[in-house]
Amino acid sequence: MELKEVKVFLERLDQDSINFDPHFYKRTIERPVNEGLVRNFLGRIDRLEKIEYGKIGRFKLWFKMSSKYSLVLIVEIKETKELKVVSAWNTNRKWQDKLKG
């Protein structure tokens, strides 16, 4: 799937088609991220900043949470038109900008 197709897929995504990997729940214990937050941002494509390729069939989605933080999601898009959230975390935008610069 091409990156442009990912955005179109997300725009048409139904909340019932979003599933969460057990790894996601394991990591939410350690991180200030929950299922409701992820579902909220997946429904707000206007906050989507960047899409990157990951492992085969996986993508990294960057959503702008605020001027200080971004929400990063690792997702799999299934042929059945379902989206599986594998992992999620928030990251400091200043820190990310320093890594780029």
Which positions does each model-derived feature cover?
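Ribonuclease/tRNase effector modules and their secretory precursors
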Residues: 1-101
